[in-house]
Amino acid sequence: MEGMERPISEAYFQEAKRHIPGGVSSPVRAFKAVGGTPPFLVRGEGAYVWDADGNRYLDYVMSWGPLILGHAHPKVLARVRETLERGLTFGAPSPLEVALAKKVKRAYPFVDLVRFVNSGTEATMSALRLARGYTNRPYIVKFRGNYHGHADGLLVEAGSGALTLGVPSSAGVPEEYAKLTLVLEYNDPEGLREVLRRRGEEIAAIIFEPVVGNAGVLVPTEDFLKALHEAREFGVLLIADEVMTGFRLAFGGATELLGLKPDLVTLGKVLGGGLPAAAYAGRREIMEKVAPLGPVYQAGTLSGNPLAMAAGLATLELLEENPGYYRYLEDLGARLERGLKEVLAQKGIPHAVNRVGSMVTVFFTEGPVVTFQDAKRTDTELFKRFFHGLLDRGIYWPPSNFEAAFLSVAHTEEDVEKTLEALGEAL
């Protein structure tokens, strides 16, 4: 499979660039960090995708995280088809959103109320507005390399696509607005404590990725988590951004895995089962500030639309009914992590492999990689070789060194062995 040709994808890419900025609807898809032509995908099944040229790839992107069950899971498709026959969207309450809200509450016991939106950006943006409305305080704390979507107040020293493109924030974000976001180092508990001591009474909320996936995978230290919870002494709300980790690292996400107690949680990706859906959720006294109950306004034409609710409900039902899935993903992830380390060590390549459950990143630098600054030491030129060596052998890894790769329950041990063999050849 080495040296796959993609002339049809190349033609599509050139045409797309005439009609769509950069030829893509989200920047990282353009392969700017790695060069070359992105495969234009036309089909997915299980752990595999096919491009317009007919090439098959073992997929570790998994639509950037939502597809924990794999592509085109038959039970998810059946639920969506059944719902589709009844209508696409109504702009009205539906039984499906009630059922999905109840499922979220079972996964996150601290949650009393859930509000559905369409994207992770909407969820985090709305959660921050709510936090400010509830506390009557102006400032937000976020951490370098944590990505919370592209709302103006959060696109400040962000990770994900912003990091890949080499811009720590974005043009078009007013400096005055950005100043309301205090940016601290991730995994620096003393830095957080110092800011809380100095400015705690001005801070509405701290938003954080419990396990970072958008600067590559970064794992929180125990003392950092302890410092986060100490923020409550100052009346500061904790917002766990679980758009990526929710329902992926455990049924109750990183909140369950790490024993966290946030005030609000944002969810997305797996929540929608492959369709656009997200949510913010939390304690009753906070969530009751949201319109129509309270003065904090948020709305959306397609929020809670039946198709996304159906896909999400089918996905969460399967995850809840099959708790062994998470054990399987942990074991498979451990095998992948171990194998990656073995191959890279054999090749004499400096590396650090960070993994939590079914999320993994290979950094090409001496470890450990604990902070955003550590992650930025990675050899991005070597990553390009790693990426294209795998892609040419039918392995579709995320096209950025600052993104997590994802496993699904459709991946097998054979798939992992195939990946490791391809890596050995590629390097």
Curated annotation (Swiss-Prot):
Entries under Pfam families matching the protein: Aminotran_3
Keyword S-adenosyl-L-methionine attributed: no
Main location: cytoplasm
Stretches assigned to coiled coil: none
GO molecular function, one term: pyridoxal phosphate binding
Enzyme Commission (EC) number: 5.4.3.8
Any one GO cellular component localisation term in the record: cytoplasm
UniProtKB keywords: Cytoplasm, Isomerase, Porphyrin biosynthesis, Pyridoxal phosphate
Signal peptide range: none
Alphabetized NCBIfam families for the sequence: hemL, PRK00062.1
Family: Belongs to the class-III pyridoxal-phosphate-dependent aminotransferase family. HemL subfamily.
Annotated protein name in UniProt: Glutamate-1-semialdehyde 2,1-aminomutase
Natural source organism: Thermus thermophilus (strain ATCC BAA-163 / DSM 7039 / HB27)
